[in-house]
Amino acid sequence: MRNAITCCEYKVDLQFLIMTLLSPVDLCRLGATSSYWRAMVRDPLLWRYFLVRDMPKWPSINHVTMPRLEALHTPLCVGEKEMEEPGHDFMTDYLKGYPACRQQWFPQRPPYSVVTSFLQSLVPTATEPRYAMFGPGMEQLDVSMVTKLMHTPDVLPVAGIPQRQINGIGSGISYVYKNQHKFNILTLYSTNRAERERARMEQQSVSNKLFIQEGRDQSGHPHFSPTPQVQEVCQAVDGFIYVANAEPGRGDDGEVEWAQIQALVDPALGSSSRPLLVLSCVSREEPDQIRTTSSNSTRTPCVDMAQRLCLPMLPNPWMVQDTVAESLSGVLDGISWLLGCSGLRL
């Protein structure tokens, strides 16, 4: 309290400089000390600065916590007179997305839902949730995330191959999440292995045989429809996993990626409540010396990935999770969110 009172004696620009050096938690504590500081710490310019500075470092983002990026380019206040009408609430945007604070923004389940979920967890289910996994990050990276998944039992043990078959696709592979829940992943590759490997070595795109391109829509965007076999998969699964290439300069055309995602989550093929997990993947961990000394990150930030894939336009719940293929870092966090969206009690 004494320090907070002392800071009031500083010039306003110096007060703002000091606030930029505080953590969001410390700022909120400062705001609780007096009405003066409560007003000061809500300054939109301060929180817009924090958003621009910190968003690229966030390891995940989802449909609840995604900031309105277009607001970063709008005036801080509306009206002829200064502060006549406040503009966008950047403080709320920041605290919703900040990893240490975001949990409180998720909708709370009513008490009866918690009891129902607990009772359901006591009864073994006949089928495990199934997810379709696809995307260029499975095929373009130097390290295969799919191969790592199958051979890293300390992260996700393989539970086996179920009997339920889908013609031309197979039955997928079942995994066990933290010795609690089984789930099944159906892997959808764009083409055969030889063509994928050649395209990876030459860093070229391949003709995606999962989709049929049907020209362009009225807005000029490409329009795709899944092949009949892939449509059968979309109707059978409980959600989707899109593996995106997060290595800068190596991602596919965002417009095409968005159109293909939109084709698979089409409400005509299943409920729009089914979740989409985007694993924003790079081959290897970023070395500490590069991470701390270079301003150029070796991965696309997850907020930028969500924007590139136009995820805020989807009716489905979605999440982007930073992932590393070599160590599978981030995979468990993404799977936890996915299973939770499917109604499993974790």
What is the predicted role of each segment?
Residues 200-248:
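Inter-motif core of Ras-like GTPase G domains
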Residues 24, 35-37, 45, 136-140, ...:
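Conserved beta-strand elements of beta-rich interaction domains across eukaryotes
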Residues 4-5, 24, 115-121, 169-173, ...:
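Eukaryotic intrinsically disordered and solvent-exposed regulatory patches
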Residues 118-159:
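Glycine-rich phosphate-binding P-loop
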Residues 1-126, 132:
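Skp1-binding F-box subdomain of Cullin-RING ligase substrate receptors
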Residues 236-346:
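Conserved GTP-binding G-domain of TRAFAC-class P-loop NTPases and closely related GTPase folds
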Residues 150-200:
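Switch I (effector-binding) loop of TRAFAC-class P-loop GTPase G-domains
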Residues 142, 193-202, 219-222, 249-260:
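Active-site-adjacent loop/helix micro-motif of nuclease/hydrolase catalytic cores
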